[in-house]
Amino acid sequence: MQGDLAALKRRLKELGSCVVAFSGGADSAFLLDCAREVLGDKVSAVTVFAPYTLKRDIRRAGGIAEALQVPHLNVDIPLPDALRYNPRNRCYICKNEMFALARKEASRVGAGHVLDGTVADDDEALRPGMKALKEQEVLSPLYECGFSKEDVIDQLNKRGREAWIHSPDSCLLTRLPFDREVIAEELTRIEMAEEYLLSGGVDPVRVRSDGTTARIEAGRDCRRLFFSEEGMNEIAAQLKKFGFRHVSLDLEGYRPGSVDD
């Protein structure tokens, strides 16, 4: 798959002005970079910060927007009632809320469109949030112009934006089983545990939680970092300080969606 950069720039020029729903991920970062290049001061970004949003994503989004000198609105929201018990359609509910807020920002600044960073190899069957895109009339120029995730990484490298490339993240709700109450303190200790493990070179990593037990999923190339008695004792002790009673390592390593296996 090969994204058409010229077509993307033409499409952005046609749109005239926009607000980018900006997660800080590589895809939306590349889109924001291109939009800034084509539209200049007629582009802005909005990032929604909920209790289940990773703070590292918020920091990353703010840094990129600042580097591009793009006006950037952070919208801090409480946990929506519809997400309190982590329903199976959580992605749709979250995206619908996020895009509605982005539309409000677009209306406030007089921008004609809301854009997001969906790419051509995002599987619609696995991305229920894509339903919200259609309902909220959000446009996905990278998708329209055939950009895959690999294309985005290639373009970021060509632009000298290597620092914007990182392991894919997902919100903290994905660390919890479906249909169980979301507790703020549990989200906090999950994020603290992941930040600790990332600081030790474990990337990607997910800390799945059932309330009292942390199940660590490490990238397959990182699993070897755990296999020493001293290292395992240190990790277990630190995660217990964060509030977990039990700590385990998933020997199969990181795999998306495994919390519901």
Predicted regions and their residues:
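Short Gly/Ser/Thr- and Asp/Glu-enriched loop/turn motifs at secondary-structure junctions
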Residues: 167, 209-213, 251
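C-terminal, charge/polar-rich interaction regions
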Residues: 205, 224-234
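Short edge beta-strands and adjacent turn/loop segments
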Residues: 199-215
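Short, low-order "capping/linker" segments at domain edges
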Residues: 257-261
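Flexible loop residues that form catalytic
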Residues: 119, 176, 252
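ATP-dependent adenylation/nucleotidyltransferase module used to activate substrates
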Residues: 1-158, 199, 214, 230, ...
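A short interface-forming secondary-structure element
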Residues: 211, 215-228
